[in-house]
Amino acid sequence: LLRFALHMAIRSSFIDYREKVDEYLTSTLLFTVAFSVSMTVIVCSVSVLLNLSIPFILILLCMLQSMSSAIIEDYSYYLMMKFNYKFRTMLMIVPNLLSVVLSVLAMLYVFNTNRYLGRVIPTAIVTLFFGIFLVFLSIRRSGFVFNIEFLKHGLKISTPLILHGIA
């Protein structure tokens, strides 16, 4: 749900907002960050209220990883439509490769008893790093733009696709 399938709207922005694609992307990414942070606060608060046995830091990292994965996917579609396949391929390979290497090292040398944390924590941190990097890259290119018109356009296209994605 955090993704809102906005990557599909980014594809259509290349037709509908040809001259403002960078601003469209930044607006989309900033919405993803704002919505994800809001949902993270709600989910973490509910987990504390319900006194769940799941560690708080694990819930937080999973929520932040979800947000960052959405950012990476949105940016990946942007790169695909720009025909920038070198950077897109790097964006698909490097975070995954880096998180696997760090996960193996973490499982071998840090998390001897809870090895699953050795996979979850490095993956979440690497994904979060790349997500934050891409948001800053987008803001640097187009400025700090949050255009409600772009957001309405994007949500009109992507919202029906949420149920499709769940199915």
Residues of each region from the PLM?
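Membrane-water interface segments that mark the loop-to-transmembrane alpha-helix transition
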Residues: L1-S47, F87
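Interhelical loop/hinge segments that connect adjacent transmembrane helices in multipass membrane
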Residues: K82, K86-L91, T113-V120, I132-A167
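Residue-level signature of the transmembrane alpha-helical core
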Residues: L29, V33, V37, M63-M67, ...
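Membrane-interface helix-loop junctions in multi-pass transport and translocation proteins
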Residues: C44, V48-L60, K82-M90, V94-F130
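Membrane-interface helix caps of multi-pass small-molecule transporters
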Residues: S13, Y78, L105-Y109, F136
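Small-residue-rich midsections of specific transmembrane alpha-helices
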Residues: L1-Y17, S66-I72, F130-F133, I162-A167
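Hydrophobic transmembrane alpha-helices of multi-pass small-molecule transporters
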Residues: F4, T40, A70-E73, S99-V104, ...
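Membrane-interface junctions at transmembrane-helix termini in multi-pass inner-membrane proteins
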Residues: S12-K20, S68-L91, S142
